[in-house]
């Protein structure tokens, strides 16, 4: 497979930290998981430093910056505190996500269209510092257009509605969500944006998304950490890598 065709896999290690924090202490170590993910074929590592520090910690981000040989995709809310942390560490990529303290996981995409001026000023220093700025959004044309206007280089399309419809057996809705994702990936690519996708992807749902030629990167975490309980982290990631590559071939 040529480098041009290869789809990148970003492995999100947040929920290794979730398990660690359930008991306190240092085990299991997210940094060890990140190194295993690299060995298993991950092209990058994603970590979300939430405002409430419910899983990934500041020390984890510092450690990842020190040990990784692949790029770090630093997920964060659009707050002054997170901006300062990102500017201090200067990770390869920063993905701006919506965040609510009461949610279990990121429930939807960022409302870029409603906050264009604020977000444009927020991401400017990050871009000047050399970080690639990505915006996590719903597959909606108005959000994509707004992300483009504020100067984002990358968008990440929220695949949760597609994955949820598949899990619920609503295949008509699943197919409609898949078509919407495909159309919006094509639209974003036409604007010159780099297109990523993620949220809720599993072995059963990854290949239709991986087959979109406009999508350059998938970010997958919760499923892989869960599957690692049964088959081990390296084999779980290697199987996802295999499915992605097969869909792209």
From Swiss-Prot:
GO terms for cellular component: cytosol. 3-amino-2-oxopropyl phosphate binds at residues 12, 23, 200, 221-222. Pathway: Cofactor biosynthesis; pyridoxine 5'-phosphate biosynthesis; pyridoxine 5'-phosphate from D-erythrose 4-phosphate: step 5/5. It is an enzyme of class 2 (transferase). The active site is at residues 48, 75, 199. GO terms for biological process: pyridoxine biosynthetic process. It catalyses: 3-amino-2-oxopropyl phosphate + 1-deoxy-D-xylulose 5-phosphate = pyridoxine 5'-phosphate + phosphate + 2 H2O + H(+). The record marks 156 as: Transition state stabilizer. GO terms for molecular function: pyridoxine 5'-phosphate synthase activity. Keywords: Cytoplasm, Pyridoxine biosynthesis, Transferase. InterPro entries: Aldolase_TIM, PyrdxlP_synth_PdxJ, Pyridoxine-5'_phos_synth. Belongs to the PNP synthase family. Homooctamer; tetramer of dimers. Catalyzes the complicated ring closure reaction between the two acyclic compounds 1-deoxy-D-xylulose-5-phosphate (DXP) and 3-amino-2-oxopropyl phosphate (1-amino-acetone-3-phosphate or AAP) to form pyridoxine 5'-phosphate (PNP) and inorganic phosphate. This is Pyridoxine 5'-phosphate synthase. It comes from Roseobacter denitrificans (strain ATCC 33942 / OCh 114) (Erythrobacter sp. (strain OCh 114)). The gene is pdxJ.
């Amino acid at each position: 497979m040529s480098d041009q065709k290869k789809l990148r896999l970003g492995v999100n290690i947040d929920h290794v930290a979730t398990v660690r924090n359930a008991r306190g202490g240092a085990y299991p170590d997210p940094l060890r998981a990140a190194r295993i993910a690299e060995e298993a074929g991950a092209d990058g590592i994603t970590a979300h430093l939430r405002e409430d520090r419910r899983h990934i910690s500041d020390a984890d981000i510092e450690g990842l910056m020190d040990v990784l040989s692949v790029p770090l995709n630093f997920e964060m809310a659009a707050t002054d505190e997170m901006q300062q942390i990102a500017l201090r560490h200067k990770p390869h990529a920063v993905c701006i996500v919506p965040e609510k303290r009461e949610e279990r996981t990121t429930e939807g995409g960022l409302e870029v269209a409603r906050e264009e001026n604020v977000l444009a000023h927020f991401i400017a220093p990050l871009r000047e510092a050399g970080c690639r700025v990505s915006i996590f959004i719903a597959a909606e044309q108005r959000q994509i257009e707004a992300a483009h206007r504020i100067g984002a280089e990358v968008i990440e399309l929220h695949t949760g509605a597609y994955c949820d419809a598949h899990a619920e057996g609503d295949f008509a809705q699943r197919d409609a969500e898949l078509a919407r994702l495909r159309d919006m990936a094509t639209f974003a690519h036409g604007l010159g944006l780099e297109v990523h996708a993620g949220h809720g992807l599993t072995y059963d749902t990854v290949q239709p998304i991986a087959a979109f030629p406009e999508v350059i990167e998938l970010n997958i975490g919760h499923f892989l950490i869960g599957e690692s309980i049964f088959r081990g982290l390296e084999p779980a990631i290697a199987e996802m890598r295999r499915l992605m590559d097969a869909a792209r071939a």
